[in-house]
């Protein structure tokens, strides 16, 4: 949080924001239910009292977190934006500044929903997958077109499919959800010749 605050100050960023760090900063490939509970605590604490929330996330498991949030917050009181970068903020060719600035603008201006913002693209959080670690277009939605594109010159988002996304949404459960950290999940791929005994 300190490095981001310093960077925004150097860029003369004029938007008022509050920065908080997760309890434990990790490589996102080590993400667990405990980390998700920490993220949820931070979101619950700030969502209703702010214009929006931006979650900065490692790209390896960003899509999983975005999908989880889209299910838990199907109709949030404010926009929730998930973003990250393929290169560190300090790198000269980093995609972090573009993603960070556009995510903050999205949190302040977009209709309330859960989105992924990456490389100037607004993506449906529930359908997002990672496709590259070497290209700025690191994420895509295979079953949905982009919801919008960011115009850096005017600092605004141009919508493509937003009205359809926001129609007929169900109310979000108001109770604060927490994951059972004792649960373990096995990812098992079924292939020809594989039997159910392999999962025993």
Spans of features found by a protein language model:
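ATP/NTP phosphate-donor binding region
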Residues: 1-45
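Conserved active-site and cofactor/substrate-binding residues in soluble primary-metabolism enzymes
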Residues: 31-34, 38, 60, 64, ...
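Internal gly/pro-rich beta-alpha loop/helix module
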Residues: 82-154
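Short Gly/Thr/Asp-enriched flexible loops that form oxyanion-binding sites at enzyme active sites
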Residues: 55-78
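Short acidic/histidine-rich motifs immediately flanking catalytic phosphotransfer sites
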Residues: 48-52
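Accessory alpha-helical/coil subdomains and C-terminal extensions
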Residues: 3-11, 124-200
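Hydrophobic helix-cap positions at the C-terminus of alpha-helices
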Residues: 11, 46, 72, 106-107
């Amino acid at each position: 949080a300190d490095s981001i605050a310093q960077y925004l100050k150097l860029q003369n960023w004029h938007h008022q924001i509050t920065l908080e760090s997760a309890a434990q900063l990790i490589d996102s490939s080590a993400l667990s239910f405990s980390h998700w509970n920490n993220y949820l605590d931070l979101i619950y604490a700030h969502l209703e009292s702010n214009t929006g929330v931006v979650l900065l996330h490692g790209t390896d498991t960003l899509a999983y977190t975005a999908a989880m949030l889209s299910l838990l917050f199907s109709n949030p009181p404010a926009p929730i934006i998930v973003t990250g970068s393929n290169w560190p903020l300090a790198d000269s060719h980093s995609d972090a500044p573009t993603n960070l600035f556009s995510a903050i603008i999205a949190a302040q201006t977009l209709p309330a929903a859960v989105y992924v913002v990456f490389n100037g693209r607004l993506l449906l959080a529930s359908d997002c997958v990672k496709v590259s670690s070497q290209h700025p277009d690191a994420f895509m939605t295979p079953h949905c077109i982009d919801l919008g594109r960011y115009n850096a010159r005017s600092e605004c988002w141009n919508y493509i499919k937003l009205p359809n996304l926001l129609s007929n949404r169900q109310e979000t459960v108001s109770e604060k959800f927490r994951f059972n950290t004792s649960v373990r999940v096995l990812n098992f791929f079924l292939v020809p010749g594989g039997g159910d005994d392999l999962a025993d």
